[in-house]
Amino acid sequence: MKYLIEVIGETFLSISDPIDHRHWFLSKEQHAYEFIFMNLFYLVVIFIGINLNKKREYENQRKPKPIPEKDYPSLLNKIVAIILAINVFLNLIYKCLRGWRVVFFMLQPCHIVSTIYCYCLLTNNYQFGRKVFKISIYYILVTIAALVAPDLADLTLPFECYNFFIQHYALLIAPFLLQAYRYNIEFELPYALISQGLFGISHFFVFEIFCFISGTNINYMLFPPPLGEFSYLTQESYRVGIAFILFILALGIGRLVILIGSKIRSTFLLKNKSK
């Protein structure tokens, strides 16, 4: 294990291109340990989720097939999708204006989830869109975190701050619209686990590697966000600690969004359609 840690640490050192003095806030050994164990943890979570889902699907084969949920076409869905698409495009322009390194920030969850929600809001492939939504609904926690503690220090270009808030409020609204007007899913633990497993691997594998290559702090994988009075969170364990906190919170908040969206659907849409 010690040799493996050394090899991974040296690999990170060889591909890294620092542009900030905090680039090595965590040691190469710390990065290597977390790269191995956190990715293993999230792979196990995905494996459990997939197997639970297979078991659930097998059990459902024996039951009568439910009547498919009705999709209520909504102009609001299209408006929110267009807003998200425009925001992603504007963010890409902003990043390109700052140089090739900054373009890697397009991997940030807000931009990826914006693209996913655009697809879910507009796709004609209802069944696949439903599965994608079952996974992506739990990422609303990232949106909430960004709105509660917005990091606007680097947003200096015209309209960039406004664009940030417009995008994130659209991201906040989108899951409720998708639940109320389109998919009306239920909380399913297998999909919740797959969701969090993918989220974790995107950080501790994909973001980790691209952070070293570009030198940019994608979703704070190199060094912590400005935490103010909570400076004790900036110790070496901040990534692991926040990862597990988000893991638990995402399941609870995702479930709450499902319940609220279903309530909106049953209270307003179904009653209005029955009149």
Swiss-Prot record:
Keyword list, A-Z: Membrane, Transmembrane, Transmembrane helix
Membrane disposition: Multi-pass membrane protein
Signal sequence extent: none
S-adenosyl-L-methionine listed as a keyword: no
Transmembrane stretches, start-end: 32-52, 74-94, 102-122, 135-155, 157-177, 193-213, 240-260
InterPro entries referenced in this protein's UniProt entry, alphabetically: TMEM164
GO biological process: positive regulation of ferroptosis
Localization annotation: Membrane
One Pfam match: TMEM164
Coiled-coil stretches: none
The organism's place on the tree of life at top rank: Eukaryota
GO CC annotations on file: membrane
Function field: Positive regulator of ferroptosis.
Family the UniProt entry places it in: Belongs to the TMEM164 family.
Name of this protein: Transmembrane protein 164 homolog
